[in-house]
Amino acid sequence: MEKFTIHTGTAVPLRLSNVDTDQIIPAVHLKRVTRTGFADALFSSWREDQAFVLNDESYSGASILVAGPEFGTGSSREHAVWALRDWGFRVVIAPRFGDIFRGNALKGGLLPVELELKAIEEIWGRIEADPSTSITVDLAARQVQVGGVNWGFPLDEFSRWRLMEGLDDIGLTLRHEPLIGAFEASRQPFLPTIA
């Protein structure tokens, strides 16, 4: 997983609330277990509408999604995180996330940033007025900066550390590879049975 310290990019304003994982990536696209190749599936039902914000070329190349309350609710789908990452998003900013989505995002290298709705509305206004508006997300400082305005965001220390170190679950486990190898080398090749 790629390390995350500071990210600067443009953003897409998704003025919708209660966006569930089935809307992020419909179930018909869940037939693969690889983490890539899902960009075309992201919001595929909504993207059929040419007026949908991801179809607007002025937001092309954006790496931050700014959404409404309750983003990523519904069933657990790692594919939702994979689709967002595959599209190019590194950060999703919203007032509240579904708990399972939030956990999957943190483990998948997508930073879920929670800001108050008032801050979200200000950011929406800025990026709609000028789609080239730059947003900086500083994970070390736990701050979002747009223009000269800064907002702090909460994130537990362990999740912050994992993202800054670029550690997914496998990477975290591999940090203990010497200990795991020593244990495996010292244990019996079979387990005793109880007669």
Swiss-Prot record:
One matching Pfam family, short form? Answer: Aconitase_C
Q: Output the GO biological process annotations, alphabetical, semicolon-separated.
A: L-leucine biosynthetic process
Any one Gene Ontology molecular-function term assigned to this protein's record:
3-isopropylmalate dehydratase activity
Identify the InterPro entries for this entry: 3-IsopropMal_deHydase_ssu, Aconitase/3IPM_dehydase_swvl, AconitaseA/IPMdHydase_ssu_swvl, IPMI_Swivel, LeuD
The answer, when asked if Lyase is one of the entry's keywords, is yes
Question: Which reaction is this enzyme known to catalyze?
Answer: (2R,3S)-3-isopropylmalate = (2S)-2-isopropylmalate
Q: What is its EC number?
A: 4.2.1.33
Q: Does the keyword Nuclease apply?
A: no
Alphabetically ordered keywords of this record: Amino-acid biosynthesis, Branched-chain amino acid biosynthesis, Leucine biosynthesis, Lyase
Q: Look up the domain of life of the source.
A: Bacteria
Gene3D superfamilies with a match to the protein in the record: Aconitase, domain 4
Gene Ontology cellular component annotations, sorted alphabetically = 3-isopropylmalate dehydratase complex
Which pathway or pathways does this protein act in?
Answer: Amino-acid biosynthesis; L-leucine biosynthesis; L-leucine from 3-methyl-2-oxobutanoate: step 2/4
Question: Which PANTHER family has this protein been placed in?
Answer: 3-ISOPROPYLMALATE DEHYDRATASE SMALL SUBUNIT (PTHR43345:SF5), 3-ISOPROPYLMALATE DEHYDRATASE SMALL SUBUNIT 2-RELATED-RELATED (PTHR43345)
For this chain, the family text in UniProt reads:
Belongs to the LeuD family. LeuD type 1 subfamily.
Role description:
Catalyzes the isomerization between 2-isopropylmalate and 3-isopropylmalate, via the formation of 2-isopropylmaleate.
Q: How does it assemble?
A: Heterodimer of LeuC and LeuD.
> HAMAP family, from UniProt?
LeuD_type1 (MF_01031)
State the protein's name: 3-isopropylmalate dehydratase small subunit
Gene (UniProt): leuD
